[in-house]
Structure formats: structure tokens, C-alpha cells
């Protein structure tokens, strides 16, 4: 029998096309070969997963806390599954519009009091400059009276058990450096000082087991664009694929120096550590679990870490395989000119994603405004997430051509890389511009089309002018890097306003591909849920 809240949810004008929305996601079994691991390693994995579950509970409270009792009360079925996929009642593929009820998504989610607006916050901070640091801190909540509460205080109920599980996991680790990192990260959960453990994390050397476990990304914050949400992923090293990436590491400092950006905005050897790991992930939580399924990450985001030791590039091999097999290649075959569609490949897409993640760690660390260094996220505001994703895409493609020109990548595969990039765009823009990656790639598509690098033929298929791609990428990389370097919010907003609308012909072409999923829904062999 339904709980009263579940009945209430079903009576709240649930979207009538719910099952069609759910069908946009291809259920994919994510396998886990338990027999590969020793009993101690299994205990380690179990403790890490238990810790991830605690962060899951926090994420829902940051995102849409009113949906927790509804989710928990619903029986298994389409509505419960779709709530889980999105982590809230807001459909990430439909510009974050509600599929339960009609209340619009609060731009600050539950990170700010709902009555607050960006203008009101900025005006208050201008009148109370001593409070700016606390208001703009990436790990504080802001109430209607502009009082701030640190995450480690607000969420202690879940952070304390999460820290305990991390310490337990450390006791089962045979890797002393990883065990020490886990203990340091456990402490960071309880005081919000992630800097020491982030340093230790980047310095880990080829760990067999690893974990993403922190409030890193700002995707939930559409108000100021600075508040982070908790995310987690248990990682197991894919040794064979990791070895293939080692060759890229030595080129990162030279790519940084080659960017179309003034020298004063290029940290000289930023990202020089650049560890790259190809991992399989059996369990994810929080912002890594819901909506857009990340196939790679570049972390941490702290520019102080980037300056000192670089950042870590992580590629989720089992998730990337699912996306390529079920979404990108099928979509490319339908949308692209036949001869170019066959050039798109899984390996080409992996290379494009690799360059994207490397490029998150390249470019300016801070914006320069009025002779001072300013945090880029703070300077750009809500447009930052889309801007940064676009910068990583475009700078990555610029860097890819640089590597080809120097013989680090085979020249004969350049067209394969470009075709794979464009096939990936068709997948990403289906998320709409309410999602950072979708907004970024919609802008990229329109800019490249304006430059004649992407065209549409009389049959409705899209074609890539390979000769025009390098110049177009160089021009766009220069624009995006300059926006970040100057922290010019108005320029960023005007740029997206000009380029982030989906053309009607592309909309119609994508509408005709509804039998191809927008993304996959990972089905993991471990218990998921929110407490």
C-alpha cells in the first residue's frame, strides 16, 4: 500500500510521458568480478561503498531534500527510477523542468534560502564586504538572513559515519600511501579543509584502488556558481589501458605553453604532475551518480593544487564503453554523412575525452580584474560551468592538433578524432542547455557551423570540413581562454546568449532519433538508495 506521501506525489501532476522519458536511458548492467579480489580487498571495497552511501544522502539534501520522502515511499516502478536517475524531480534532459508538480527548480537548489536572488546577495555583500568570503565559500550554506553554515557542521550526521568507513577502509589497504590518504580525507570531511588530502591524492602513484570523495563540482549552483556538491566513486585500476595513457603526460607543460593566451595568464608548468588513471568504477554516488554520467574527470578543482602539483585525470573505462557502444556510435551513424560516420570510433572518442580532461587543468588559474587575482568561478558566476566545459573541449581539440603536428599522435588519425568529437556533440546536446556540458557543446556546434567547419547536406546529414576545424578551434579556444583570464562575466553571458540555442534543423534531426538513448542508466550490483 502506498505511503501517503507517495500518493501525494502521484496526485501532483506527474508528467504523463514519464515512461517515454525513462526510455531515453538505456539500462546497462555494470559487472563486478568479486572473485578477482582477496578477502581483504573485498572488505576495503565494501567500506568505500558504505562511505559513498553517506555522501549520497547529503547530495539529495543539497539538491532537492523535499524529494527524499517521496522517493523512499514510492514502490519500485518508472517514477521511482526516474527520480533516482535525476536525483530530484527536475528532468536534466528537459532544461531541469519538473516532472512532478509544476514548481520551477530553485536556481540555488538547497544551497541557499529560496528567497535569495543573485542580485540581492551581491548587493548585500557590497554593503557587508567582510562577509564576502563566507558567503562565496564553496562549502557553506546561506540562509535568508545571510547567515552561513559550513558543510561539515550542517551535514555532520552523515560525514561522521562516512569518515569512519574511510578509516576502516584504510585498515584493509595494503597500499600505505592510499591508506594515509583515506585517513586524511576522513579528517577533511569533518573540518572542510581538503587541501592536505588533495595534495596527497594527486601524488598517489598508480594505485590499484582509488576513490573520488569530496564536494568538488558546482553543477547544482545556478545562483552564484560557486557552491560545490558531494560526489563519490569507487575506482579500480585498469592496468592495461592506464599504460597506454602514460605517453601523454610528458607533453602537458608544453601544451600549456602553446595555448593562444598571453604568457602572464599561463602558469609556467601548471599540471606538471598530471597523473592519468584508467579505472573501472563499480559504484558511484552524489553528483557522479545522477543525470549526466561522467566518463572522465579532472580533479581536484582547487587552483592552489594545480599550481603546486597539477591535477589527476581519471577515465571511467566501463562507463565510457557503455556510452560509446549504446549512444555515440549509433547516433553518429544516423546523424553524420556515411563516410564520416564510419570514421568515428571508440578509440577516437577516448582520445578526445583524454584531451578534454587534460585541458581542464590548463589555462589560467585565476582571473585578473583591476590588478588583482580573482577566483574564476566567482568572477564568471553561473555561466562558469558551461564555460569551463567548453574551454576543456575546445582547448583539448586545439591541443590534439598540436600533438599531431609534433608526431605525438598519428597524422592519419586526425580525421578520426574530429569525427569522433562531432559524434559526441550529437549525444551531449540532447541534454539541453540546462546542463553544463550540453550548453557548452551547443555553443561549440553553432560556432563551428558559423565558421563552415560543420555543415548540413541536402539529405539532412551533417558533414565535417576537416580543413576548417583547426582554425575554428584555435579561434574559439582564444575566446574562451580570454574570457576566463579576464573574468569577464558580461562577455561570457553574451557569448552563450549568441551561440547556445539549438537550431531548428538540428532539433528535428535529433527528434527523429528517439529510439537511440540519450544516455545509459548504470545498474550496479550493490544496494543504492538515499537515507
Question: What residues fall within each predicted segment?
Answer:
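Sec-dependent signal peptide recognition
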Residues: 1-7
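Boundary at the C-terminal end of the N-terminal hydrophobic targeting segment
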Residues: 7-13
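N-terminal mature-domain "stem" immediately C-terminal to a signal peptide or N-terminal signal-anchor/transmembrane
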Residues: 14-95
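Fold-level signature of zinc-dependent metallopeptidase catalytic domains
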Residues: 17-30, 35-47, 51, 128, ...
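N-terminal accessory alpha/beta regions
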Residues: 60-132, 136, 140-141, 145
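Secondary-structure edge/capping motif, primarily at the C-terminal ends of alpha-helices
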Residues: 62, 169-173, 487
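Long, well-structured alpha-helical subdomains associated
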Residues: 397-494, 498
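Extended, compositionally biased alpha-helical segments that mediate assembly or anchoring
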Residues: 477-531
Amino acid at each position: 500500500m502506498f505511503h501517503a506521501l507517495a500518493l501525494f506525489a502521484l496526485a501532483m501532476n506527474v508528467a504523463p510521458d514519464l515512461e517515454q522519458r525513462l526510455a531515453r536511458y538505456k539500462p546497462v548492467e555494470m559487472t563486478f568480478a568479486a572473485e578477482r579480489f582477496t578477502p581483504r580487498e573485498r572488505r576495503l571495497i565494501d567500506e568505500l561503498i558504505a562511505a559513498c552511501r553517506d555522501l549520497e544522502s547529503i547530495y539529495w539534501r543539497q539538491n532537492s531534500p523535499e524529494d527524499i520522502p517521496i522517493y523512499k515511499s514510492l514502490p519500485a516502478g518508472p517514477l521511482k527510477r526516474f527520480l533516482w536517475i535525476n536525483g530530484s524531480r527536475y528532468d536534466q534532459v528537459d532544461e531541469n523542468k519538473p516532472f512532478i508538480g509544476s514548481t520551477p527548480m530553485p536556481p540555488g537548489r538547497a544551497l541557499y534560502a529560496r528567497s535569495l536572488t543573485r542580485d540581492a546577495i551581491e548587493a548585500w555583500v557590497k554593503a557587508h564586504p567582510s562577509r564576502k568570503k563566507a558567503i562565496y565559500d564553496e562549502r557553506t550554506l546561506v540562509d535568508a538572513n545571510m547567515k552561513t553554515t559550513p558543510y561539515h557542521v550542517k551535514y555532520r550526521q552523515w560525514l561522521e559515519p562516512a569518515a569512519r568507513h574511510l578509516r576502516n577502509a584504510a585498515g584493509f589497504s595494503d597500499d600505505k600511501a592510499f591508506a594515509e590518504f583515506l585517513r586524511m580525507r576522513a579528517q577533511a570531511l569533518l573540518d572542510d579543509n581538503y587541501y592536505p588530502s588533495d595534495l596527497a591524492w594527486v601524488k598517489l602513484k598508480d594505485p590499484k584502488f582509488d576513490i573520488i570523495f569530496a564536494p568538488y563540482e558546482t553543477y547544482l549552483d545556478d545562483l552564484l556558481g560557486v557552491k560545490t556538491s558531494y560526489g563519490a566513486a569507487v575506482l579500480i585500476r585498469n592496468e592495461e589501458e592506464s599504460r597506454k595513457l602514460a605517453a601523454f603526460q610528458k607533453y602537458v607543460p608544453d601544451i600549456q605553453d602553446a595555448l593562444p593566451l598571453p604568457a602572464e595568464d599561463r602558469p609556467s608548468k601548471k599540471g606538471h604532475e598530471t597523473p592519468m588513471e584508467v579505472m573501472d568504477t563499480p559504484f558511484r554516488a552524489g553528483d557522479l551518480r545522477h543525470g549526466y554520467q561522467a566518463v572522465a574527470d579532472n580533479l581536484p578543482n582547487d587552483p592552489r593544487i594545480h599550481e603546486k602539483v597539477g591535477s589527476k585525470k581519471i577515465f571511467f573505462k566501463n562507463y565510457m564503453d557503455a556510452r560509446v557502444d549504446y549512444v555515440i556510435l549509433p547516433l553518429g551513424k544516423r546523424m553524420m554523412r556515411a563516410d564520416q560516420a564510419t570514421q568515428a570510433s571508440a578509440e577516437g572518442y577516448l582520445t578526445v575525452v583524454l584531451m578534454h580532461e587534460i585541458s581542464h587543468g590548463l589555462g589560467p588559474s585565476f582571473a585578473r580584474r583591476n590588478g588583482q587575482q580573482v577566483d574564476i568561478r566567482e568572477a564568471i558566476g553561473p555561466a562558469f560551468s558551461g564555460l569551463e566545459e567548453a574551454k576543456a573541449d575546445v582547448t583539448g581539440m586545439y591541443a590534439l592538433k598540436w600533438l599531431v603536428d609534433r608526431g605525438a599522435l598519428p597524422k592519419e588519425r586526425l580525421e578520426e578524432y574530429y569525427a569522433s568529437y562531432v559524434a559526441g556533440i550529437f549525444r551531449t546536446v540532447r541534454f539541453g542547455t540546462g546542463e553544463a556540458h550540453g550548453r557548452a557543446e551547443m555553443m561549440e556546434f553553432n560556432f563551428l557551423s558559423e565558421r563552415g567547419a560543420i555543415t548540413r547536406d541536402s539529405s539532412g546529414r551533417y558533414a565535417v570540413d576537416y580543413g576548417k576545424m583547426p582554425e575554428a578551434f584555435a579561434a574559439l579556444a582564444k575566446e574562451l581562454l580570454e574570457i576566463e583570464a579576464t573574468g569577464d562575466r558580461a562577455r561570457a553571458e553574451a557569448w552563450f546568449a549568441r551561440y547556445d540555442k539549438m537550431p531548428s534543423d538540428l532539433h528535428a534531426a535529433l527528434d527523429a532519433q528517439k529510439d537511440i538513448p540519450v544516455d545509459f542508466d548504470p545498474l550496479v550490483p550493490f544496494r543504492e538508495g538515499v537515507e
